[in-house]
Amino acid sequence: TPGLFSQRELIELPLEDIPDTEYSFPLPGGKVISPYGRGRGRHSGIDIKTYAKDTIRSAFNGVVRMSKSYSAYGNVVVVRHDFGLETIYSHNFKNLVHCGDTVKAGQPIALTGRTGRASTEHLHFETRVNGQHFDPNIIFNMKEQTLNRQRIGCSKKGNGIVVQQLPTIYPKPLQKKYPMELFKYPNVSLHLQNVSLKERIEL
């Protein structure tokens, strides 16, 4: 969601306040086969594997901002959530939702595949704020496949972002829930080259 920091210095992700019914591990039962930050290209997400055509689920309530075939991502779904968070699901065999659809946490949105640049059937999962990817392990405990109950703060630093844990008891938030309608863009782009506030994506 580029442009968030033109309105706020700190984007707060209050994970501790999200009810159990409003989050879902994106690929239940899956195993992480490639971690975030792997390799010289800095892996922009994590790769999770179960079996071909397994059900991929939306991590949180949100609105689908992209659902199409896109370069090395293959079939990809981008979901925009409250608080400026976006999640990305790619290499899908088939997308089950369309751009503009409202989705609930745990709702099936795609089936695992190996479209795009992928050597095996799996889910490439990313978390982003302001168009910048960060480690999904901050959001989810990958071993337990549960939500990390903490309060996260995202701030701008140069062309990137800094993501850090905030105290449980924190002064009055600099922002509350972002209405998703506040950030309407005609297009959503997962740039594969360095432009403005985007980092190069290496799958």
Question: Language-model segments: what does each one mean?
Answer:
Residues 81, 101-158, 162-163, 170:
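Conserved, short, structured surface segments that act as functional micro-motifs
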Residues 34, 50, 66, 91-94, ...:
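A residue-level detector for short acidic-glycine micro-motifs
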Residues 22, 35, 49-53, 61, ...:
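A structural micro-motif recognizing beta-strand termini
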Residues 37-39, 53-55, 69-70, 102, ...:
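Short polar/acidic secondary-structure junctions
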Residues 12-15, 29-58:
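Short glycine/threonine/proline-enriched tight-turn/helix- or strand-capping micro-motif at secondary-structure
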Residues 58-96, 126:
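Zn2+-dependent peptidoglycan hydrolase active-site motif and core
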Residues 55-66, 97-112:
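Short, well-structured beta-strand-loop connectors
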Residues 1-35, 145-203:
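Polar/charged, compositionally biased leader and regulatory segments
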